[in-house]
């Protein structure tokens, strides 16, 4: 073991290897520090012997067999025999269970023994996709007598529930793994829950890599069919070079790759970004005539600073980097477009380069960027310019001819209903959903519940006579709100048996360590109605659907009706409860990071790899925190995380409650989409979000807290998007991309100029209900790409950016002990000025006429 000591002995951190200590020292930019090598002797128990339990660790993993056909009981018995002989020699105990096609294994022993053994296990060609479910210290051996005992599922139990449930949870878990953010995946590999990890400050080199003029590609109707293939190629090129140079992909954002490296990999980062440009150039030269890949160019900005690796959000989560340096990096990447350079980096990055590379760079001047008071000094490598205008001209004059891509995009409405991917929230809109006070409640949103509610409503009261009688199975997991006794379980069984016999529903219910796992099977509509009632039962929470699909025949005989399989089954194989419990917990955690469309498609019994690229019209929403850079530049990283977490939870709650789908969480920015006919719902979500921010400020009005200065602007626009999954090199992204994706960000940005918190474009206004369209919007003097814009009327939805900025300055001044700055005469006048585009109460106006000569209507 190695100890790193700095700050005159005030800061101490331990490491298992010397390399870990050195990397931490370099990444943390610690100059004056000393490293010591120490040996830890095992503790002595009260009986005078060595207490091995003080140095034990337990590791559980899931993997998939590469050849399930050969995994018969004899094959597994031989595997277990060899493992037992080997593991006894090194003092490792545990168990191995196989439920086709998945292996479940737990090993326990010392750190050194487990690291050695698991490295060999991971390299074994008999399995793949080795995913750690749990990994941590333990107080003693739980499986000391097992020693890798063969545990084929058929040898443990003939109960079909075990086989079905283990397969369904393991299959869903394994399929969702590739959609995880890399940082969250690394946490799970260490046996940690990403959502439970505290924020981790770090020094990083951050980049934003742009696919040049990707919006123009999406806007060109001749290239829409190839958009998914272009994105998939971009994802693969970025993943190969970033991860191959020691970096990490943070996220992909509609033709943008955000990545980061430790500071001792700065030169590797710049080389990787240059290699991405070279790889795209090589791909362009190899394409057949008509291929849109020949239009792919990259442009990047790089910056260095302190950031925080943390989990943001709860209902939908993102494990990402937060910090002021992220915003600055984005501004530098935008500046690269203006300076016509493929790679632009800041002075801070230049300082991290070695002498040899530093001599190659040349200055690109000092420039003022949005959100920063001081200008930034930037540098570039000498080389040919990248003229964005030239790329745009190539795209506009490009014709694909007879070229046909490998991933064609299909119009969503042209597909049969049964083949359409579940891209929308199908919750019926007949009755307004109740508004619940607060955000981020404990009850989770279920992956399939919205679709199930719709089915139940369509079924009506006479489901047994006229409803869908397709034989269907559904499996869900949930957490008990309190420990369940035998009497509690007996009461559940009596009620379930009586109720389900009338509906011809069979199944099984498992209760393991506070976890319910239930499988239901029966006529589809009857089962769906029953499931919706089960969800409301106060005896459990966090209800999540794992699997739902039609079946040919029942797995559970009618005479069982509903069978409780608890102690009888688990007594034959005690480790089974650990496997079930850990799988369920990991699945529940994983589901929040994966796009809702993928989760719904997967839990409906489909392979996510079969998701078809589609295009459709949607109402796009974009929102972010006003003056975020000013608010956070003098705040601690923990406060930045707190602000973003609070805001993201509010956004996801409002959006999901109104039937929208969250696309991306980008620091303080959230993007989402609603169905084309969901304009009113999108406006309602925006109003709910802005109201939350106002109530948050009021709650902290008398406290020096950064949350007392949080406000937001919301932009809404309508347009065509392409929805497709991209990537094949171990990282998969489900992308929602279109020209509207970039345009809605511009719509959101003008909220500060026109004085309205919510701004919509003409296409959205045309899709509003008559009442809201004719009496709830006010024209603004601003237009985006020729589209007139409107603000949502109402005094409660006015946005005073000057007041917000003064509040932020006053907060920072008060916290630093300074006197608040006096208002300049011009600023004082602005307090009484009506913001551009805002109408005084009592004034009347009319909606502006669009280019098509649309209606004009009286508004307040």
Swiss-Prot record:
Cystine crosslinks: none
UniProt keyword annotation of Amino-acid biosynthesis present: no
Entry cofactors: FAD
Keyword Magnesium assigned: no
GO cellular component labels: motile cilium
Biased composition (Polar residues): 847-860
Renumbered residue ranges of the record's region Disordered: 420-443, 819-860
GO biological process: cAMP biosynthetic process
Subcellular location: Cell projection, Cilium, Flagellum
Enzyme Commission numbers on file: 4.6.1.1
Catalytic activity field: ATP = 3',5'-cyclic AMP + diphosphate
MF-aspect GO terms: adenylate cyclase activity; ATP binding; blue light photoreceptor activity; FAD binding; photoreceptor activity
Family: Belongs to the adenylyl cyclase class-4/guanylyl cyclase family.
Function: Acts as a photoreceptor for the step-up photophobic response.
Subunit structure: Heterotetramer of two alpha and two beta subunits.
Name of the protein in its database record: Photoactivated adenylate cyclase subunit beta
Natural source organism: Euglena longa (Euglenophycean alga)
Primary gene name: pacB
């Amino acid at each position: 073991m190695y100890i790193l000591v700095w700050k005159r002995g005030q800061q101490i951190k331990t490491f298992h290897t010397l390399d870990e200590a050195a990397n931490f020292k370099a990444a943390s930019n610690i100059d004056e520090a000393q490293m010591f090598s120490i040996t830890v002797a095992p503790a002595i128990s009260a009986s005078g012997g060595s207490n091995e339990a003080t140095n034990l660790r337990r590791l559980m993993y899931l993997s998939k067999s590469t050849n399930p056909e050969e995994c018969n009981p004899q094959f597994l018995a031989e595997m277990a025999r060899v493992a037992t002989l080997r593991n006894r020699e090194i003092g490792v105990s545990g168990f191995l269970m196989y439920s086709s096609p998945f292996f479940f294994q737990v090993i326990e022993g010392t750190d050194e023994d487990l690291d050695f053994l698991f490295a060999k296990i991971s390299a074994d060609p008999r399995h793949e996709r080795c995913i750690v479910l749990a990994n941590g210290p333990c107080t003693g051996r739980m499986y000391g007598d097992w020693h890798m005992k063969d545990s084929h599922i058929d040898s443990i139990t003939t109960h079909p529930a075990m086989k079905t449930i283990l397969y369904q949870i393991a299959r869903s878990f394994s399929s969702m793994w590739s959609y995880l953010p890399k940082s969250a995946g690394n946490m799970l590999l260490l046996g940690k829950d990403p959502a439970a990890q505290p924020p981790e400050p770090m020094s990083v080199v951050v980049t934003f890599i742009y696919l040049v003029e990707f919006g123009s590609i999406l806007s060109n109707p001749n290239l829409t069919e190839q958009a998914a293939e272009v994105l998939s190629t971009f994802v693969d090129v970025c993943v190969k070079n970033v991860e191959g140079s020691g970096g990490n992909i943070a996220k992909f954002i509609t033709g943008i790759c955000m990545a980061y490296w430790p500071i001792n990999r700065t030169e590797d980062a710049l080389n990787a970004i240059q290699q991405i440009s070279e790889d795209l150039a090589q791909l362009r030269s190899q394409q057949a005539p008509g291929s849109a890949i020949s239009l792919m160019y990259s442009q990047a900005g790089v910056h260095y600073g302190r950031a925080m690796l943390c989990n943001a959000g709860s209902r939908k989560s993102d494990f990402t980097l937060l910090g002021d340096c992220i915003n600055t990096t984005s501004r530098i990447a935008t500046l690269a477009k203006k300076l016509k350079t493929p790679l632009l980096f800041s002075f801070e990055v230049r300082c991290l380069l070695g002498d040899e590379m530093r001599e190659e760079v040349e200055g690109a001047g000092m420039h003022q960027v949005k959100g920063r008071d001081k200008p930034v000094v930037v540098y570039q490598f000498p080389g040919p310019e990248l003229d964005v205008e030239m790329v745009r001209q190539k795209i506009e004059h490009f014709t694909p001819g007879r070229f046909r891509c490998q991933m064609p995009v299909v119009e969503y409405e042209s597909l049969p209903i049964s083949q359409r991917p579940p891209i929308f929230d199908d919750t019926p809109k007949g009755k307004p959903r109740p508004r619940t006070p607060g955000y981020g409640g404990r009850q989770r949103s279920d992956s399939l519940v919205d679709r199930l509610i719709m089915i139940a409503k369509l079924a009506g009261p006479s489901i047994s006579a006229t409803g869908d009688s397709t034989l269907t199975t559904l499996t869900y997991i949930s957490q008990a709100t309190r420990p369940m006794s035998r009497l509690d379980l007996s009461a559940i069984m009596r009620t379930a048996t009586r109720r389900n016999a009338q509906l011809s529903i069979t199944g099984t219910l498992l209760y393991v360590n506070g976890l319910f796992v239930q499988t239901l099977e029966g006529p589809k509509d009857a089962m769906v109605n029953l499931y919706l009632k089960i969800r409301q039962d106060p005896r459990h929470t966090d209800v999540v659907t794992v699997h739902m699909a039609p079946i040919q025949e029942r797995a559970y005989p009618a005479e069982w009706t509903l069978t409780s399989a608890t102690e009888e089954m688990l007594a034959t194989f005690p480790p089974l409860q650990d496997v079930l419990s850990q799988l369920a917990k990991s699945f529940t955690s994983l589901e929040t990071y994966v796009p809702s469309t993928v989760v719904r498609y997967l839990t409906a019994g489909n392979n996510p790899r079969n998701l078809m690229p589609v295009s459709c019209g949607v109402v796009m929403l974009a929102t972010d925190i006003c003056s975020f850079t000013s608010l956070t530049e003098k705040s601690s990283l923990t406060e930045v995380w707190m602000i973003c977490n609070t805001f993201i939870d509010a956004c996801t709650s409002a959006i999901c409650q109104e039937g929208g789908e969250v696309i991306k969480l980008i620091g303080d920015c959230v993007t989402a989409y609603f169905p084309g006919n969901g304009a009113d719902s999108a406006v309602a979500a925006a109003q709910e979000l802005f109201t939350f921010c106002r109530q948050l400020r009021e709650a902290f009005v008398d406290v020096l807290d950064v949350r007392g200065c949080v406000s937001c602007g919301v932009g809404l626009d309508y347009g065509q998007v392409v929805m497709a999954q991209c990537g094949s090199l171990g990282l998969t992204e489900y992308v929602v991309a279109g020209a509207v994706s970039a345009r809605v960000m511009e719509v959101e940005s003008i909220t500060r100029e026109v004085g309205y918190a919510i701004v919509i474009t003409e296409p959205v206004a045309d899709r509003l209900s008559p009442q809201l369209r004719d009496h709830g919007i006010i024209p603004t003097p601003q237009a985006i790409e020729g589209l007139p814009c409107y603000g949502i009327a109402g005094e409660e939805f006015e946005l005073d950016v000057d007041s917000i900025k003064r509040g932020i300055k006053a907060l920072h001044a008060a916290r630093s002990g300074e006197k608040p700055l006096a208002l300049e005469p011009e600023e004082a006048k602005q307090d009484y000025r009506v913001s551009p585009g805002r109408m005084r109460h009592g004034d009347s106006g009319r909606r502006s006429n669009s280019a098509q000569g649309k209606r004009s209507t009286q508004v307040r």
